Regions:
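Short, hydrophobic alpha-helical packing/hinge segments within bilobed ligand-binding/sensory domains
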Residues: 27, 99-100
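Short, well-structured N-terminal submotif of metal-dependent ribonuclease cores
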Residues: 1-40
């Protein structure tokens, strides 16, 4: 079985790295079993670094914990610099466009998100060459 390529948005990364959200378990299991690979680019990684420095609900991460989260991300994800060439729909939130670009540019199977605008985009457009799904919906695709 070949592995599927995945893109995670920043909030899903936070669920994995900071919040230990059990909802991300299907994605973690697919990666651990070698059924999925996660890709990230410099733009998405920069956003993750920035957000790790914000107060996150009841967590404020000190520099050591931020560094550990980033190292875990870099251990799990493959850093890829991409050039996307296909025409993509425009997100309502311009900050989310980078995730569509990364998914398209890396020929990902799925963009995994809980962002309502991205999920609505997937429902209201002609099919994209990748799925935009929640972590729970991802488990149904496997």
């Amino acid at each position: 079985m070949s592995s599927m390529r995945l893109v995670l948005d920043t909030n899903v990364w936070l669920d994995w790295l900071v919040f230990d959200d059990p909802g991300i378990a299907p994605v973690q299991a697919a990666v651990a079993a070698g059924h999925a690979d996660i890709v990230i680019d410099a733009v998405c990684e920069d956003e993750l670094i920035r957000v790790l420095g914000y107060p996150l609900q009841k967590w404020t991460l000190d520099a050591m914990r931020q560094s550990a989260c980033l190292e875990q991300c870099r251990h799990v994800a493959c850093r890829i610099d991409i050039q996307y060439t296909m025409a993509l729909p425009q997100c309502d939130d311009p900050d989310d466009q980078k995730f569509l670009e990364l998914a398209a540019g890396t020929q990902a199977a799925c963009l995994i998100t809980k962002d309502r605008a991205l999920l609505a985009l997937a429902r209201h457009l002609p099919p994209l060459p990748f799925h935009i799904v929640t972590p729970a919906e991802f488990s149904a695709l496997q």
